[in-house]
Amino acid sequence: MTDGTPMDRDATQLYCPNSSCQAPNAERSKFCQRCRTLLPKRYLWAIEPGKLSAEMPEILDDRYILKYDRVYLDTHPGILPHVPEQVPPEIRAYLRLFPHRWHIPQIYGSASDSASDSELDAPSIWLLENAPIEPRANGTWRQFPHIDLAWSQVDDLHKLGWLWQILNLWTDCVREGVASTLLDSQQVRVDGSFIRIAQLIPDESELSPGLDKLGYLWSRWIPTTKPPLRDFFEQFCQYMIDGQLHTPEQAQMVIDRAIDRLNVTRNYHWQVTTLSDRGPSRTRNEDACFPLTEKPDPPRSQVLGIVCDGVGGHDGGDIASGLAISTVSDRVSRIEPSPKSSLAKWSRVDKLDRVREAIAEANDAIGQRNNDEQRQGRQRMGTTIVIGQGDNNDLFISHIGDSRAYLVNTRSFYSLTVDDDVASREVRLGYAFYRTAVHQPAAGSLVQALGMGASSHLYPTTQRFIVNEDCIVLLCSDGLSDYDRVEQHWKTELQPILDHTTSLTSAAHRLVEIANTQNGHDNVTVALMQLRVTPNSNHTVDSTELLACLTPLPSAPAPQDNHATVATEVSTTITPNRRSLLMPALAIGIPLTILAGFFLPPVIEQFANRNNLALESARDLPVPPPENDTAEIQLEDRIAIEPPNAATTTTETSEPLMVGQQLVVRRPLVVYPNKIETSPPLDGAIKSGAIVEVKAIDKTIDRHWLQLRSCPQDIASGGRECGLTADRNTSHRPCRSCQHCRDTH
């Protein structure tokens, strides 16, 4: 690791985040010396898009203190970081790649040189959190090693796992114009089993690099690769360079064959324990878990853990979570383990498909129960779910809602899931910064949960991780994860399991105790899964066996959801969360029909061009049917929409717009009263971030017109904006008439 000496920690003052205290404390202090509030220490990595200064300012914005090189400490963690109102294009990729946050650092905020006389003299500096840096207890710093340095120091399974992860990032990085990041080995850092990106590097050319460029880069590591992997790796790189392996999915399948061969040289020991508690403030426990055991079974190569959280405040949340547990556990428990031989039938994609089917079955079972009991509105049962499957060195995580999964190894902590809520959706779309998005109204409201809509509109996130070292996986409901309790306590409560100073059962009890004493507002459920990896000296693998993994080459499959869905524009009737049990005004539950005209060239395929137009395809989005008490508002005015850029043309291939397609508005669009060119625009506009549905397509001589259906709140008007709020015990009808804020609720 790269070492460095930071500034004097005793000289740095860290201000208490408690708004009623804000006392200064020494950086070394864990708790505020006045009020005993935990002091979060956020060490951030500074970047300057487009330039790299030789020296960084010692203080930024009178709050960020330079500790070493480009590492800053936020001395006012209780104050929201500054961010611009509009997301600059050069850092949007960080937001849209938010679901890959265990690999890619995220934007914390922006800052400027505090010593500068003018902001114009101080170009924006962006501060990244979750960067591959780590403070040491003795005050020195280390940066995780880049892959060039680490390659020769790890075993073959680690090497193959790193390659698989880079391929897993490739497609999304290409789409966001940052594939060059993966071609710069200085930006590709490693932490045990995991790839960590230092910062994103934009592509210089509009033409995305091909997979052959990865092959050229990786071939530099052939001389430091030892048998039995060397011959396989050399041929694998050549196939990438020659184009015989031309898709990431195809290359991943070959790597998986080699991983399965090498897995016989390891023993994987999984154990799981669960614990659920009603909590101090609830009359019943709406959480559920699987398996129902505090004492772990003997270690084995495959385990299953599930946590469900009945949507708080809904009658029958405990029934919904119980139905989900019984349905999913029964279906998933019957899935066969992954093969340990490359000659066995490929099964990982099948495994993920089976999990999705199990989630759909659970959703249907809860929905049918709701219908049989004629439950409407708040009476309808719903639940979140998070599923963890350990299978040799494969970890499969699937989830719906805001129940979470975390992974802890001997060095680091990873949040593996992204909540299905409004705040995360805005970040994934590139519209908001996470630190500020979570403080917006209805930010924590769920956009999907089991039992709240048809399975055809349910989009579970299913992911696969390759873990080749001892680790702990935590699944939990938000009774524990709220207020960053896991982030605060993972070192003291979870890492000791790995050095055998505490047990799974004891750790589970401690986590429940923390949830009840430091949160206490909800039920709490945890499932702890432990993996221990030991060598298997009874088996060896030679070069010939690994070379056989290249014959025959697999055909290029359709891309699979083996990773997080990135920038998925979730458009749905929003499910209330525990903090706000209403259908928020952000939802599209109340449709508004308008006619939209784009001043476009007569090539309708260009409507959906992601790079240039204001409408972004949202065809993959879940759009549950509106509730029975919603009503469609028909406007008699015919409204056209001004184009975002009439001069824009494109040669990219895009799918034509179709009736029923959902689109995301990329920039605010001006609306007109009719299709007559001389008509002045109306006061209202469709806001950036609005999600609309194509109801009809009409063509005139020089324009295309769209009839769109949109949420009333997405029409900005001369009156005030409709924004319903409620506490957890309140239920409101969504706004029925917002065109000019007539406040009919």
Language model: regions and residue ranges:
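Non-catalytic signal-transmission and effector/linker regions of two-component phosphorelay proteins
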Residues: 2-8
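Long, charge-rich alpha-helical interaction segments
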Residues: 208, 212, 221-222
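SH3/SH3-like beta-barrel superfamily modules
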Residues: 640, 682-736
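Short Cys/His-rich metal-coordination motifs, predominantly Zn2+-binding knuckles/fingers
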Residues: 19-21, 35
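N-terminal sensory and localization modules of signal-transduction and trafficking proteins
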Residues: 22, 46-53
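PP2C/PPM-type serine/threonine phosphatase catalytic domain
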Residues: 6, 13, 27-39, 66, ...
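Short, Lys/Arg- and Gly-enriched loop/turn segments at beta-strand edges
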Residues: 483, 672-675, 701-707
